Amino acid sequence: MTEQKYVVALDQGTTSSRAVVLDHDANIVSVSQREFTQIYPQAGWVEHDPMEIYATQSSTLVEALGKAGIRSDEVAAIGITNQRETTVVWNKETGKPVYNAIVWQCRRTATICEELKARGLESYIRDNTGLVLDPYFSGTKIKWILDNVEGAREQAEAGQLLFGTVDTWLVWKMTQGRVHVTDYTNASRTMLFNINTLQWDEKILAEFNIPLSMMPEVKKSSEVYGQTNIGGKGGTRIPIAGIAGDQQAALYGQMCVQAGQAKNTYGTGCFLLMNTGQEKVTSHNGLLTTLACGPRGEPAYALEGAVFMGGASIQWLRDELKLISDARDSEYFATKVDTSNGVYVVPAFTGLGAPYWDAYARGTIVGLTRGVNSNHIIRATLESIAYQTRDVLDAMQADSGIKLSALRVDGGAVANNFLMQFQADVLDTEVHRPKVTEVTALGAAYLAGLAVGFWDGLEELQGKAEIDRSFKPHHDEEKRQRRYKGWKRAVKCAQAWAVLHNEEE
């Protein structure tokens, strides 16, 4: 029998599908990435084509193995990590989606959320799912598809439709429709899963008019769910053995498996997660209570704060404002000026996430004077990412009663030294950047590898979490508080803007 030397992580993100191959020492051997189409049918709506998601993801698997000359029988397991909340509904007979995937960023269900609030469901949802009633989560997206796609409601009631977050869709496709499964971390993002009983919540399903028959089976994040022969020659079947939503996978990849450990991922959005172990901490500050992974991939509780616009605001500087030609240039221009010259950018393009939860907030730039130039605006945009992180971390520390000793960071924007130093200054906390910044893929690979015995336990992997650089806070306290006060004033200017605007039309 061929020696199994590798584990593959499939990282299905918001803008691209990636495959990352790791060896036994958790070194990255090969990476393949493909972008796919973003569909914007109207303002505030975001969709993906589920068939394109699957096509790009399966081709990256074949490509990553091919690039490194790895045969499929050398792969011990596949782990999947995915953009969370994004909703796919498909017909189990034809295998075809009844509608495009509705993406986590999509705000089309804001009115459904208002109706559900008016019916008094908010506190039940909060207490039992740990989430706030917001268009972000899958529940109202499924309801929208069933209510608006012709024939969908009838098919669902006849037991012909299946729902899945992206992990579920990929596993279903990769196993030729044999396995309909998700893990606790993804289930906890649907707004339909009871995090107290660890079961689908039948009361919420009934209120949303979603049949239980559509829901996948929920399993822990580290176990063999099924086998796939994608990328396999001669019928080799590779076990699919790990699943976790991208943020929980990153938390695991950063080795934050004990209560009180936290990380921030700077991707399209920013996601701060703190593991709270077996204790469910209820937030009084607009954070989410959600499920993460314990040391062996079993469900553990976590607090989460989501910032909708992190790296996406740098893309906006590049694509819409044309102030930079490459996202990496933002650091160079931001450091050409000493301060933002009193300017604050609040990138609330799709509303504000934690701790504000204002779907009607809109982006704003305040403090403009004649002396403000493009470098100040670039700097203020980067600073907004750090301020939003502080908003969330302050809330997290208040809820958990834990003062963070250091923040572990990952994601594309952590390569920006200016942003990382400013983050440490704003938080008055050390920021630790790991050597391997592919922590989301690492997390999925670890979960899969542990399930099949490729690694014995986390102790074996602890040494992999090396720190590349620590950023220590510099600012004096008075300056720190003054700047943060200015940020809070700027946020007030952005809040509830869309409501006011609609009244004027």
From Swiss-Prot:
Inhibited by fructose 1,6-bisphosphate (FBP). Pathway: Polyol metabolism; glycerol degradation via glycerol kinase pathway; sn-glycerol 3-phosphate from glycerol: step 1/1. Sn-glycerol 3-phosphate binds at residues 14, 84-85, 136, 246. GO terms for cellular component: cytosol. It catalyses: glycerol + ATP = sn-glycerol 3-phosphate + ADP + H(+). ATP binds at residues 14-16, 268, 311, 315, 412. The keyword Nucleotide-binding applies. Glycerol binds at residues 84-85, 136, 246-247. It comes from the Bacteria. InterPro entries: ATPase_NBD, Carb_kinase_FGGY, Carb_kinase_FGGY_CS, FGGY_C, FGGY_N, Glycerol_kin. It holds the Pfam family FGGY_N. One of its GO terms (molecular function) is glycerol kinase activity. PANTHER family: GLYCEROL KINASE, SUGAR KINASE. Key enzyme in the regulation of glycerol uptake and metabolism. Catalyzes the phosphorylation of glycerol to yield sn-glycerol 3-phosphate. This is Glycerol kinase. It comes from Vibrio cholerae serotype O1 (strain ATCC 39541 / Classical Ogawa 395 / O395). The gene is glpK.
